[in-house]
């Protein structure tokens, strides 16, 4: 017997002794295992800190985590944080990317002038549905300005920049693609960085509302200082939640990634530069719904209490929220109809109404129309007892016509009644006024 056999035999004996001495059992406990979701991606981050309404639902095989989509869907559900080069316009850059990627649609998060460089969020295919929401997000610029005359002290420049904050009147510059009418735009902060008296040039950082013209701010700065001024260079270093330090890519990256995908079948470069659309929604309050109601929401259904699994704190009525699946996919952007405290305390009602559906229809299976009444209605349509739209015809049994209530018909009748009441209201008021006049005239006589 060799050394190896002895060793294995000894290990076996030790294992047997340990099994006899120890009690290998899972003790019963009321404590639930702690789940650390702080490192989970995108919308699933801090999932364990969401308020739980219920954990009972049937998981569906359909759907997939945003980071595990196949490459075709990954690209069509993604966006770039592009470093726009100086000279080409935003529309030119977007059309070039459309041609490189051979996709159906592209959009961007807000136009940059041809000479301006920096952050430009380029949305691809399905992500273009979020382009409008990103256009309204806040922007941050770094600007180089030039004054036409010398200024005694750079503190005056700093004070003038501080005056140009808050709500400002602006008229678009002469070279602009919009109507030149007076408008109000909010500048949140103008941070003075540097001023060179020899060249009469300075740098400042501007955090402002979308649609603000930094060129106009430079002109106003010159007017306040009494010497005139103009913008020399401009770079956008933040657009919405994307800034220049976070996954910024160039046009060369896009071209190289597509080349690697076409020739080498290498997806890694493309997955590195393209980010899932869910990354644009990480600042929204979240509501997680059951898999069974996902497709209904894609077809325009309202989000009701029975379909809710988890929800965020501090949800306010009328604010935008994101409706998501248990796998972390964004279904739609919705307008909240209930606050967090209301959701926690009620057992029925409308939580939110969808504003913009993001997910395609029929990704998840249909789970409505499976009840006894709906099944009976489908059978009657097959048998010819109802027309193809499910409405009564000559052959429809009288019992069905009495029992079945068409909600759209009832709603229409209610709307007609309300319209009639609105029309009759001024007539009633005029009659009452006429009666009062008659009674007052009789009293005077």
Curated annotation (Swiss-Prot):
Cystine pairs: none
Keyword Plastid: no
CDD domains named among the record's database cross-references: PseudoU_synth_hDyskerin, PUA_Cbf5
Catalysed reactions, semicolon-separated: a uridine in RNA = a pseudouridine in RNA
SMART domains referenced in this protein's UniProt entry, alphabetically: DKCLD (SM01136), PUA (SM00359)
Keyword annotations from UniProtKB, A to Z: Coiled coil, Isomerase, Nucleus, Ribonucleoprotein, Ribosome biogenesis, RNA-binding, rRNA processing
PROSITE patterns in the cross-refs: PUA
One example of a Gene Ontology biological process annotation: box H/ACA sno(s)RNA 3'-end processing
GO CC annotation: box H/ACA snoRNP complex
Chain residue ranges for the region called Disordered: 1-32, 407-445
Biased composition (Polar residues): 20-32
EC annotation from Swiss-Prot or TrEMBL: 5.4.99.-
Localization terms from the record: Nucleus, Nucleolus
Pfam families: DKCLD, PUA, TruB_C_2, TruB_N
Residue ranges of every copy of the PUA domain listed in the record: 284-359
GO MF entries: pseudouridine synthase activity; RNA binding
Active site per the UniProt annotation: 113 (nucleophile)
Subunit structure of this chain's protein: Component of the small nucleolar ribonucleoprotein particle containing H/ACA-type snoRNAs (H/ACA snoRNPs).
Job description of the protein: Plays a central role in ribosomal RNA processing. Probable catalytic subunit of H/ACA small nucleolar ribonucleoprotein (H/ACA snoRNP) complex, which catalyzes pseudouridylation of rRNA. This involves the isomerization of uridine such that the ribose is subsequently attached to C5, instead of the normal N1. Pseudouridine ('psi') residues may serve to stabilize the conformation of rRNAs.
Family classification: Belongs to the pseudouridine synthase TruB family.
Protein's name in the database: Putative H/ACA ribonucleoprotein complex subunit 4
Naturally occurring in which organism (per UniProt): Caenorhabditis briggsae
Classification lineage: Eukaryota, Metazoa, Ecdysozoa, Nematoda, Chromadorea
